[in-house]
């Protein structure tokens, strides 16, 4: 069984995606659940976690609504304004709203904030406490420069489950960095942090990456987090800039010990996000997904 813990769905006609320029311009098109389903079917992926892209609660509401039409969407990592004095009310509205039971986490693009210590701000700390109180996870979208602050925040919120996206975005194309390795080690020392094995192909040379070139980063994450705190994520459709869905999945599989794959490819996602996978498996998610609407 496989769970994809990180992918996106979007429609540029419905919101702003200012980063879809230059090399990322090919992504400026609609990507629907219907587009993803053939990939899931071809590769035996039974369930997924769809992750926000826009800093807009409306996108989170739209993603939650999609889960009612596509049962393979086991969870939504959405967005709320962590700096708002009303963040607890925003979370409550989402959790008690339409399909709110599928909200499993919150994410904010910390890497886009000018201040590398943004996570340490008092208002953000209050917001993270509200996320913990709501029983949700928090996805860390950070680069190596923010890893030290992320480790401090994880230590300050031991009851909050943190999930590091894309291994903290190591500069694979440049051959890695000591800053990334130090930061990853510090964050991994916190037992309430999981790490997604995702996004590596787009941190590498898009045209020349190889499994062997990614292997040291997978090995570093495995050494730091161990088999119980690693999750597979495709980062579809962003990954398609450099690789197919199947290539991404295969690269991660080949870079890990076979005895750990069961945990990394579904059990850990269930633990980190508290996914209700039993119901999904019983329903036959992939078959149900093929019968859903193409949106």
Task: Kindly give the residue locations of the regions a language model identified.
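Catalytic pocket-lining loop regions of alpha/beta-barrel enzymes
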Residues: 118-231
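Active-site gating/metal-coordination segments in enzymes
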Residues: 60-145, 152, 196-200, 208
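Divalent metal-dependent hydrolysis catalytic cores, especially in the metallo-beta-lactamase
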Residues: 22-29, 34-55, 73-81, 104-111, ...
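Short, electropositive alpha-helical surface patch
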Residues: 58-74, 158-164, 214-223, 245-256
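Mid-to-C-terminal alpha-helical segments outside catalytic/metal-binding sites
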Residues: 1-3, 26-47, 220, 224-231, ...
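Conserved, mostly hydrophobic/aromatic
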Residues: 6, 48, 63, 76, ...
């Amino acid at each position: 069984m496989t769970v994809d813990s990180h992918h996106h769905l979007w429609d540029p006609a419905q919101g702003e995606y200012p980063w879809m320029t230059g090399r990322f311009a090919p992504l400026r098109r609609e990507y629907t659940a219907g587009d993803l389903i053939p990939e899931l079917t071809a590769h035996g992926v039974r369930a997924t976690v769809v992750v926000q892209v826009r800093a807009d609660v409306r996108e989170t509401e739209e993603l939650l609504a999609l889960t009612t039409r596509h049962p393979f969407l086991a969870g939504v990592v959405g967005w709320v304004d962590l700096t708002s004095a009303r963040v607890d009310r925003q979370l409550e509205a989402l959790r008690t709203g339409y399909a709110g039971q599928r909200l499993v986490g919150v994410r904010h693009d910390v890497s886009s904030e000018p201040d590398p210590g943004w996570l340490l701000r008092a208002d953000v700390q209050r917001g993270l406490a509200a996320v913990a109180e709501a029983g949700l996870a928090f996805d860390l979208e950070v680069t190596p420069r923010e890893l030290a602050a992320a480790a401090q925040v994880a230590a300050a919120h031991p009851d909050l489950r943190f999930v590091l996206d894309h291994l903290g975005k190591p500069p694979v194309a440049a051959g890695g960095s000591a800053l990334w390795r130090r930061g990853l080690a510090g964050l991994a020392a916190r037992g309430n942090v999981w790490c997604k094995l995702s996004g590596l192909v787009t941190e590498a040379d898009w045209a020349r990456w190889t499994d062997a070139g990614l292997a040291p980063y997978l090995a570093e994450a495995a050494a730091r987090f161990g088999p119980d705190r690693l999750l597979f994520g495709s980062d579809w459709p962003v990954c398609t800039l450099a690789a197919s869905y199947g290539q991404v999945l295969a690269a991660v599989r080949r870079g890990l010990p076979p005895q750990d794959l069961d945990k990394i490819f579904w059990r850990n996602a269930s633990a980190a996000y508290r996914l209700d996978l039993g119901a999904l498996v019983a329903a036959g998610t992939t078959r149900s997904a093929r019968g859903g609407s193409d949106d």
